[in-house]
Regions:
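Single conserved hydrophobic/aromatic residue that forms the stacking wall/gate
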Residues: 1-7, 11-12
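Structural motif
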Residues: 24-26, 51-52, 78-82, 98-101
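Long hydrophobic segments that form regular secondary structure
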Residues: 13-54
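Short beta-alpha connecting loops at secondary-structure transitions
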Residues: 23-25, 64-69, 107-118
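Short, solvent-exposed amphipathic alpha-helical segments in soluble enzyme
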Residues: 8-9, 39-47, 70-71, 95-100
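Active-site proximal loops enriched in glycine and acidic residues that flank catalytic Cys/His/Asp
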Residues: 29-32, 38, 53-60, 83-87, ...
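Peripheral docking tails and interdomain loops at the edges
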Residues: 82-138
Length: 138
């Protein structure tokens, strides 16, 4: 049975997917990029860099939340990063200190993992850039 969803019913509220003690950073993602965020979080944890991963499938719902809720999600750590297999434009408003990993150029045709890797969207490349950022700006 398929149900017809209307308007905001299609948007699901954000979820904390991975967290722990001594959080150094927050990683925001949605859809298929959440798995990439989790892989990145695991790679960073092996280097004693701990992160919180947030699945945010509907920014419109998040934006309507009260300040204390948004602060709980975004302000627990000093640094916030986002992963998006499209434009970073919608994520930039959440990042005061940190980076957006995204694909700003188009026209590459290949299996998605090769395209992601070409644009730097692999857990290996993202974790290295995050580690470099933290060393440089902390």
């Amino acid at each position: 049975i398929l149900y017809r969803l209307v308007g905001s019913e299609m948007c699901i509220r954000d979820r904390i997917i991975r967290t722990g003690k001594n959080i150094n950073l927050t990683i925001l993602a949605s859809g298929s990029e959440v798995n990439l965020a989790i892989e990145t979080s695991h790679k960073l944890a092996k280097q004693k860099i701990y992160s919180k991963v947030i699945s945010m499938p509907c920014q419109e719902i998040f934006d309507k939340q009260n300040k204390s809720y948004k602060d709980k999600i975004l302000k627990e750590s000093k640094n916030t990063f986002s992963i998006e297999a499209g434009s970073k434009m919608s994520w930039e408003k959440y990042i005061e200190k940190g980076l957006s990993f995204s694909i700003e150029d188009f026209g590459k045709s290949a299996p998605y993992k090769k395209v992601y890797d070409h644009f730097g969207l692999s857990s290996e490349k993202i974790s290295k850039k995050i580690k470099f950022y933290l060393k440089k700006w902390q």
